[in-house]
Every structure is written in C-alpha cells, then in structure tokens.
Amino acid sequence: PNVVGLYKPAGGAAWNAPTVDPARGAIYVGTGDATTAPPAKTTDAIMAIDINSGKLLWSYQATENDVFMGGCNGPNRSEACPSPMGPDMDIGNSPILTTLPSGKRALLGGTKSADVFALDPDNNGALLFRMNAAGGPTGGGRGGRGSIVWGGAADAEHVYYGAGAAGLAAIRPTTGERAWVFQPQGRGVALGAAPTVIPGVVFQGGSNGMLYAVSAADGKQLWEFDTSQDFETVNRMVAHG
C-alpha cells in the first residue's frame, strides 16, 4: 500500500538575511535548530541555494541532532517536547563572504556556542577551519563563556564577532586564529550585537548601553559613548536611552 507521511521534519528557520554570491549564482543562508525529531541535515546549517532555480547546491551542518523547543526547557514538559532536548545551536547570523589575501574566498558563520567556521564556497562548502571565538573547545554547548547570535563583520585583515560575555574577537580568516580580543571594563558586560567595521575602526555595542570604538589593528579601545542618557528628539521632546 502507498504510505503517506503525515508529519515531516520541522524547524530550520532562517533568522537572517541571505548573502548573495554573484560569482557562483548562489545565495547563502544560516538556519536554526530542528523542532521535531529526527532533525533534517539542513538544520543548524549554512545552505547554498541556486539563485535562479532555488535548488539546494550544498549544505554544511554545524551541529547535528539539535532538536529544541523554547517552551520545553521548564519543569512542565508536554508530550510534544523533544527528548532529549538539543543544545539550541541556531546559526542566527548572516554568512560572511570574504576574499583572502591569496585570492581564495571564504564563507564564515558562527553558532551560539561561539564556534566560528569557514567554508570554501568554490568547493561545495568544504570546511577550511573551525575555531571557538571565546577561546574554548569547539562543539561545546551554550554553557561556555561566549555565544554568537546576531552577526559579524569583515575587512581585509580580520573577521570580527561579538561573542557575548567573551568579548569582541578578531579572527584571522586565513588560519582561524584569534588576533586579539577586546573585553570592556565592568562585570557582566556582554558584546552580543553585530559589530560594524570601517577602515581602522570596529564599532561594538554592549549590554551596558555603551558603544565602543576599537582599533581594528590591535583591539585597543579608542573611545566609548554612553547611550543611556537623555536626548532631544527632532520634535524637541526628550527621550531617554
């Protein structure tokens, strides 16, 4: 008899804007975790999709068997909750496509465990390196010091990721080594926002309301600005923070 599947894999949401690669006629998108078991191979992944046909070209899965539902991490779990619960390692950031000094290209993404991986977009997404921006082991869970959620930035020398409590990390895309780490003063300050880079300067927002300007060469702080203050708006009303 014919068998009809009533339920198929769910999850793998795309949190982020896709990255366009005109040279290969492809777009790249990061995906989240699965919400049903067994998880699809395209969850917690970067997917390359043909820009003309919409067909999948290749996919790199950063975390396997990650089935997670936000309403299931409390004491009252329903029968619909996955067991065991996965580590919740979504790739929430847009992939970064950059060209190395050698002319070779690299596609980078980050996970909630602060893992950063580089793929070869010209070789079916072959893994170039995988490292941890927080300085810990790769493949860990969210119990570590750092987490990458919202995105990074790149220039000719480095790729930059705000790794939460682990600070702002500059990574050499040729080797996967950390060039420097900026950690602001004060306890419990997380740098989770996506940084912005211009020639010579990286801008990074903090959970303490501070905006930091950091030297792209060595990670030294250039200045800081406290956004938690009163501002006069365009209609002369005063707003705070």
Q: What label would you give each PLM region?
A:
Residues P1-P9, D21-I27, T36-I91, I96-G241:
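Extracytoplasmic/lumenal domain signature
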